[in-house]
């Protein structure tokens, strides 16, 4: 849950085995401030090396930006089961980075994120990029993976607790984005 009356720093993560997007925002009252975003890109190598790159990259980002909470896009079931499993492993590396720093992790579906940020759960990537740019008063559209991560953080900042909130103590919470 978001504490009321104080600012909070949120790291949003859009997990991917090849490209993991990240975005950091701060919420102070109803004000959202952009702090940074980008992508952790893995080399074409074995799965363990790619997962380590994701874990190490997000660990650096957490140390640099000091978020208090983490919002992660939930894995959707793909037509290709192998792709779904690989994406789940990338997501696991991302969650592990947060848990190593004793941060609570909140999950949101793509539908929840798009509904919260764009007002349409079936919005196109370009619409998400445009709304993220406007909500955070950016000079240009962020890259798609970074925009998705920022949108996830914005969804959480808007008061969502996600389908599952995984705290360090494995305490489950339920809720959703407004």
UniProtKB/Swiss-Prot annotation:
Protein name per its UniProtKB record: Crossover junction endodeoxyribonuclease RuvC
CDD domains: RuvC
Molecular-function annotations in GO: crossover junction DNA endonuclease activity; DNA binding; magnesium ion binding
Record function comment: The RuvA-RuvB-RuvC complex processes Holliday junction (HJ) DNA during genetic recombination and DNA repair. Endonuclease that resolves HJ intermediates. Cleaves cruciform DNA by making single-stranded nicks across the HJ at symmetrical positions within the homologous arms, yielding a 5'-phosphate and a 3'-hydroxyl group; requires a central core of homology in the junction. The consensus cleavage sequence is 5'-(A/T)TT(C/G)-3'. Cleavage occurs on the 3'-side of the TT dinucleotide at the point of strand exchange.
Lineage: Bacteria, Pseudomonadati, Pseudomonadota, Betaproteobacteria, Nitrosomonadales
GO biological process: DNA recombination; DNA repair
Keywords noted in UniProt: Cytoplasm, DNA damage, DNA recombination, DNA repair, DNA-binding, Endonuclease, Hydrolase, Magnesium, Metal-binding, Nuclease
Top enzyme category: hydrolase
Nucleotidyltransferase recorded as keyword: no
Binding, Mg(2+) 1: 14, 145
Family: Belongs to the RuvC family.
Subcellular location: Cytoplasm
Major site of localization recorded for this protein: cytoplasm
Binding-site residues for Mg(2+) 2, renumbered to this chain: 73
Pfam family, any one: RuvC
Gene Ontology terms: cellular component: cytoplasm; Holliday junction resolvase complex
Cofactor remark from the record: Binds 2 Mg(2+) ion per subunit.
Keyword Amino-acid biosynthesis found: no
Catalytic activity: Endonucleolytic cleavage at a junction such as a reciprocal single-stranded crossover between two homologous DNA duplexes (Holliday junction)
Cofactors (names): Mg(2+)
Signal peptide: none
EC number from the UniProt entry: 3.1.21.10
InterPro entries per the UniProt record, alphabetical: RNaseH-like_sf, RNaseH_sf, X-over_junc_endoDNase_Mg_BS, X-over_junc_endoDNase_RuvC
NCBIfam families the record matches: ruvC (TIGR00228)
């Amino acid at each position: 849950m978001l504490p009321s009356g104080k600012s909070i720093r949120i790291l949003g993560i859009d997990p991917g085995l090849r490209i993991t997007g990240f975005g950091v925002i701060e919420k102070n009252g109803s004000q959202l401030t952009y702090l940074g975003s980008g992508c952790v890109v893995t080399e074409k190598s074995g799965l363990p090396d790619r997962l380590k790159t994701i874990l190490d990259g997000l660990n650096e980002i957490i140390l640099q930006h000091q978020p208090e909470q983490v919002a992660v896009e939930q894995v959707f079931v793909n037509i290709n089961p192998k792709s779904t499993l690989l994406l789940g492993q990338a997501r696991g590396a991302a969650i592990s980075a947060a848990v190593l720093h004793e941060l609570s992790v909140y999950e949101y579906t793509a539908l929840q994120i798009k509904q919260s940020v764009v007002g349409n759960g079936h919005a196109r990537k370009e619409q998400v990029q445009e709304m993220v740019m406007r909500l955070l008063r950016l000079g240009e559209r962020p890259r798609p993976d970074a925009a998705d991560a920022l949108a996830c953080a914005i969804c959480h900042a808007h008061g969502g607790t996600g389908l599952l909130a995984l705290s360090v103590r494995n305490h489950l919470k339920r809720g959703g984005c407004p």
